[in-house]
Structure formats: C-alpha cells, structure tokens
A protein has these predicted regions:
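Structural core segment of the AMP-binding/adenylate-forming
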Residues: 43, 47-106, 110-114
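ATP-dependent adenylate-forming carboxylate-activation enzymes
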Residues: 11, 32-33, 50-68, 80-83, ...
Length: 306
C-alpha cells in the first residue's frame, strides 16, 4: 500500500543520511532490474538530498566504468545479480555496493523539504547510440514540468473508461511497467502515477511478460515496438484474454505503423503517444487522439490542426 511505501521511503531517507556524510548533492547509483525497492531508494535518496543516478546494468564494463567515473557515486544500491561484469564492479566499487533493501532496519525519518526547484535531482544516461553516453541532468523543475499534463491525461483515461467500459466501476487504474526503470519512460511512472494514487505493477523480465500480466491486471502499459506488435497480434488473432484487461498501450508513434494503431483503436484500445527528449521527461507532448487521420500525428501547435 502507499502507507507501507511511504514508511519504507522514510527508512531509506534515514539510511542514506546515516551512510553518506554531507549528503546534499552526493550521487546514489541504482543498479537493479525492476522491483519495489527501486522506487523506495529513488524517493529516499532524493528526499535525503542526494542525486539519483539510474544505471543500465546490462551495459558493458567499459561503458559502466566510464559512466560511474563521471558521476563518482557515494553508494550504489544494487540487486547483486551478475549481468556480465559483476567482478569488475566489485573490484572497483565493492566498498560502495549495498543491497536494494539496505534501508529495511532503519528508523523512519521525518521528511524535510531539502530539494530546491532547480537543484540537480536525477542523472540519467542516454543509450550512447550517437557516441559516448551522456548524463542528462534533471532538476525538480524540468522533471515535473509534465506532471500537470500527465494528471490531465489521467482524467482523459477515466473519461475513456467510463464511456467504453461503464460496467467497470474501479477507478483506481494500474500501469504495467515492463520496460526497465533506468529508462525514463518507466522511471517517470514512479512519480506521475503516484499523483493519482494509482498502482504501478512492476515486471522484471520480458520473458515473464504474459505470466506477470496474467497475475497483475493492468489498464495501461508503456510499450516498445516489439510489445506493441505483440499486443496487436494478440488482438488480431483472438487472444486478447492473454492481455488480462490492457486497454491503453502508450508509446511514441514515430516507431509505429499508423494503420496498426488505427486498427487497435477500432478494437477498443486507447492509443497514447508521447513525444520529447529525456530533458522533457519523454512527455513534451501527449497525443491521445484516436481518429485515424491524427492517431499518428506528431504534435504541432493548435493552429496547425485540421
């Protein structure tokens, strides 16, 4: 529950403050597959005054060595799994490694607002597809610029649900998070879904996609092209039951075929697309137009719309 979540976040605040001297602005790396503790440590580090560094644990050691060398983490909370270079990480940062649940025995802290609107809050590395990976600096101000849009979009989701699924009276929606939490599209869900008090269903491995989806009913899902195509095939082939109620796939339409999106919309899926770079939290513009003519439209000012 959110009550338990907040208590654990308070414990994490205590843990980080007790284990990182002069913590303000110090870096806390998070290197783990998706799990509950990822959210706890993210909020805990930020509320303690530290800077969260999300780490793609599946990068090569030279890539990780470069990135960690740039940020100089004071601690790295991690899941202990060897993704291919565990011995290198232990040799270089063994004294800074902590388990993801290191906070569990700490006393809950009183929360104090110590984060300035323009203070560095998160460092998120790019994929490195255009050269060496770069750390994008996110503050509270630019990180939460899109939250109002996200909350309004939540209202649009409810409007759609009430119109198309009036028999379902549960307005506590849930989001299936299968994309990794080091990716902005999933990381931001830790924050924006909490604004509504809605649920985030975390899945750690794409190989368990259908199993986890079957265990956790979800309304929305952030998708990469492979997942959107899988959803499309399930709908087309009469296997929609496998999706356990998913009705709002969200992606970036630049990646998807417009005809496929339109057909999914005709089959009762609410298609959402977001546009933007990491600096705008991936949601500089949100398009939830379901009309075939505009479902794949890249966002433009209102006076450009037909």
């Amino acid at each position: 529950t959110y009550a338990q979540y907040v208590q654990d976040i308070r414990r994490a605040v205590t843990y980080f403050k007790e284990n990182i001297p002069d913590i303000k602005g110090k870096r806390v790396g998070i290197m783990s597959r998706n799990c509950y503790e990822y959210g706890v440590n993210s909020f805990g580090a930020i509320l303690a005054g530290a800077v969260v560094v999300t780490i793609n644990q599946k990068k090569t050691w030279p890539e990780l060595e470069y990135e960690l060398g740039l940020v100089e983490p004071s601690l790295i909370v991690n899941d202990g799994i060897d993704y291919g270079c565990r011995p290198d990480i232990e040799a270089a940062y063994g004294d800074k490694l902590r388990p993801m649940d290191a906070f569990k025995d700490s006393a809950p802290a009183e929360l104090v607002d110590c984060v300035g609107h323009d203070d560095l809050m998160v460092l998120m590395f790019t994929s490195g597809t255009t050269g060496r990976s770069k750390a994008v600096m996110l503050s509270e101000r630019n990180f939460f610029t899109t939250v109002e849009c996200q909350v309004k979009f939540g209202d649009a989701m409810l409007d759609y649900k009430h119109e198309h699924m009036p028999e379902d009276k549960n307005d506590v929606l849930s989001n299936f998070a299968i994309l990794p939490l080091f990716h902005l599209g999933t990381f931001i869900c830790l924050f924006v879904w909490a604004c509504k008090g809605w649920a985030l269903n975390l899945s750690a491995d794409i190989r368990d996609f259908y199993r986890d989806l079957g265990l956790m009913h979800s309304d929305a899902i952030a998708v990469a092209p492979m997942l959107m195509e899988a959803i499309y095939k399930d709908v087309k082939r009469g296997r929609r039951a496998r999706l356990n109620g998913i009705w709002n796939p969200c992606g970036s339409s630049a990646m998807f075929d417009g005809a496929m999106l339109a057909e999914l919309a005709q089959q009762g899926m609410m298609i959402t697309q977001v546009y933007g770079m990491t600096e705008t939290c991936g949601d500089g513009i949100i398009n939830y137009e379901q009309d075939e003519k505009h479902i794949r439209a890249v966002g433009k000012p209102d006076d450009h719309a037909e």
